[in-house]
Amino acid sequence: AIDDNKSCVGVYSGGELIFNKLPENLTKTWKYAAYLDNMDVEYAYIYANGQQLAEVCPEHLLGDWKRVKKKFEAYLKTFQIAKVSLYDNCLYDLVPHGFLKEFFNVRNNITKHVFENYDKPDNYDFLSETYKTVYDIKHQQLNIDYNSIQKASLSHAMKGYLHNLKKYEKRCSYNIFGTKTGRFTNTPDSFPILTMPKALRGVIKPQND
């Protein structure tokens, strides 16, 4: 999958970027996206027990991966500075297709390495369904009302924390492999709902109240 945005259907397969219509022979990829839900696809990310691509990358691909990842992160930084949300835009509309082919070619080779060298977890089906659930949660926008907090009553530290909260997308992204005990953690780019101080939790409002 090129993009995990639900409305941005696209895959890299056979050396080409394919949009809107998915190839019928797609059976393996790195991570889940909603438009793959009705297909019999396995995810290398789950085989790798949540490890990042750099952690599972074979030595002979590591240089290529570092190079394309650095350039990819530069694009993401540009979008962040320009306040362009990838929840509202498709990655393939923002990044040159030539680079996307290069990036996903390397990623596909790492993915292939994982499937060839890692055992399928005994609880793969459970992990897959759990991963799809947290994916759905990530794509639901939180109802945040920063004005509901009486700022005058907050300590200096809490005012600083509240200010920093506004840097995050109003979405919760969970890592299902975050702890050895099986508890979820928030990913670094997630709204930090699991670690929010009690004094600030009132900014989160119900969706259907």
Residue spans for each PLM region:
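N-terminal low-complexity regulatory segments of large eukaryotic nuclear proteins
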Residues: A1-I2, K6-C8, L17
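Acidic, glycine-rich two-metal-ion catalytic cores of nucleic acid-processing enzymes
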Residues: G14-G63, R67-D209
